Amino acid sequence: MANSQRSSSLIDPRNGFCTSNSTFYSKRKPLALPSKESLDITTFISSQTYRGKTAFIDAATDHRISFSDLWMAVDRVADCLLHDVGIRRGDVVLVLSPNTISIPIVCLSVMSLGAVLTTANPLNTASEILRQIADSNPKLAFTTPELAPKIASSGISIVLERVEDTLRVPRGLKVVGNLTEMMKKEPSGQAVRNQVHKDDTAMLLYSSGTTGRSKGVNSSHGNLIAHVARYIAEPFEQPQQTFICTVPLFHTFGLLNFVLATLALGTTVVILPRFDLGEMMAAVEKYRATTLILVPPVLVTMINKADQIMKKYDVSFLRTVRCGGAPLSKEVTQGFMKKYPTVDVYQGYALTESNGAGASIESVEESRRYGAVGLLSCGVEARIVDPNTGQVMGLNQTGELWLKGPSIAKGYFRNEEEIITSEGWLKTGDLCYIDNDGFLFIVDRLKELIKYKGYQVPPAELEALLLNHPDILDAAVIPFPDKEAGQFPMAYVARKPESNLCEKKVIDFISKQVAPYKKIRKVAFIDSIPKTPSGKTLRKDLIKFAISKI
């Protein structure tokens, strides 16, 4: 592969393409990163200048926390974790909780100590969460009385939010503290904490990965600092703006945006406990929200229910909707702008492994490039590589997107899969091309993940469960297109001879074993699953067949 050293004289300013190494460079402002090696993400964010007063608002209770109170709470919780609980640099701490304004405090406290933050989806079943615990081996978990039973058999110590929560958890769970008391306790003034380095792991977030198996992604403090530095370099909103957080904070999309980036900009974030269209629009009106960050299915719902929304809610302060998780079609973008003419729609592209780096739309003019996910993020390099030959390609040629930059994760935890090369290139698993003006277009997904309402569903996991059914000979799971959800899991099932297995029984069999977003919602029966000579499922053939029947 060509040497990645850039030659500015050979870089086309129109699209950022360098002919000497077939690499695309960002057209955005250069990324300025701190030179200090001993620096954690919490310290970096807290050192920023804030013009706003309120950091977070709980939409359910209207409870507010100011920036000054937030940092005081972060300091006190970190002190308790260090001296009372014994959390040290490198220890893993799990957060298993629905959205609350306590989550940013917990996350920032944990990472300030050099401990490693990991999160789990509250909707996951106990067995799914316990598998993740077995892999990441957390020393402590922050959770709620409602979710504590899911980790009761793990034996790990837990911290709850309130004192009274202790009475509501199963016997046998080791409760070592509550967040309310930790935030009130004066710092101990004891020994200085361990020094944290930028290369230390800060977060261990679980991504489905390119093969569909759940993997922990190791991201360093330096990776997260680079993500936040991009927002500081090109702040996409002014500090007086108000955001509504509807996305889950356990996910990279929520964590990177609302625990880190918007906090560094000094903006106010209103946190909803869960997504509900009515509650979201009521919060937009009540708090005069200016910015929404959404996944595409919510955008579609806002289009379909625009007339009811405009009659019931005052959305006059709303100026921007940012969308991620999947590309927006021209029809959806134009449909939204027609219904909400004073609101701009910007979209972006990133992965758990890239920590927010990828591409984004940053202006009204750029948003008119329909179908594109934007220009490369500042500090990002990209290559388009033929997935079969490994040849590096050029403008308007489709291949696998490779990304490089300071935000790219260190790699997978306890997994030898090489998706980050020795030169630091992240193989995204997405088929893309970059046009003459440097805009990135997503064509298809090599990784075969199903994206249901912004959630990633690995087909391999569902296929393994299906094959445990006594009447199923073989099975394949594919993404089936859906206007509201984007995609949902559909199963092709080869029944054993003499079996009278029906669609409902297959759906019920899976629904008892997985989180709601992973449920199979359509089943078709087939004599045999088409496969390559090497035994790999020809999933694309099944997708084409399913779509042809619509």
From Swiss-Prot:
Keyword tags: ATP-binding, Ligase, Magnesium, Nucleotide-binding, Peroxisome
Catalytic activity: (E)-4-coumarate + ATP + CoA = (E)-4-coumaroyl-CoA + AMP + diphosphate; (E)-4-coumarate + ATP + H(+) = (E)-4-coumaroyl-AMP + diphosphate; (E)-4-coumaroyl-AMP + CoA = (E)-4-coumaroyl-CoA + AMP + H(+)
Motif Microbody targeting signal boundaries: 548-550
PROSITE patterns (alphabetical): AMP_BINDING
The keyword Ligase is assigned to this record: yes
Catalytic activity, EC: 6.2.1.12
Any one GO MF annotation of this record: 4-coumarate-CoA ligase activity
CDD domains on file: 4CL
Binding, (E)-4-coumaroyl-AMP: 253, 325, 347-348, 352, 447, 451
InterPro entries: AMP-bd_C (IPR025110), AMP-bd_C_sf (IPR045851), AMP-binding_CS (IPR020845), AMP-dep_synth/lig_dom (IPR000873), ANL_N_sf (IPR042099)
SBD1: region residues: 276-347
Cofactors (names): Mg(2+)
Residues binding ATP: 207-211, 215, 347-348, 352, 430, 445, 536
Binding site for CoA: 274, 453-454
Primary site of residence: other
Any one cellular-component term (Gene Ontology): peroxisome
Compartment(s) of residence: Peroxisome
Induction or repression: By wounding or by jasmonic acid (JA) treatment.
A biological process from GO: ubiquinone biosynthetic process
Region called SBD2, residue ranges: 348-412
Entry annotated with the keyword Cell membrane: no
Annotated function: Carboxylate--CoA ligase that may use 4-coumarate as substrate. Follows a two-step reaction mechanism, wherein the carboxylate substrate first undergoes adenylation by ATP, followed by a thioesterification in the presence of CoA to yield the final CoA thioester.
PANTHER family documented for this protein: 4-COUMARATE--COA LIGASE-LIKE 8, LONG-CHAIN-FATTY-ACID--COA LIGASE
Comment field on protein domains: Both substrate-binding domains (SBD1 and SBD2) are involved in the substrate recognition, and are sufficient to confer the substrate specificity.
Family: Belongs to the ATP-dependent AMP-binding enzyme family.
Protein name: 4-coumarate--CoA ligase-like 8
Annotated organism of origin: Arabidopsis thaliana
Gene: 4CLL8
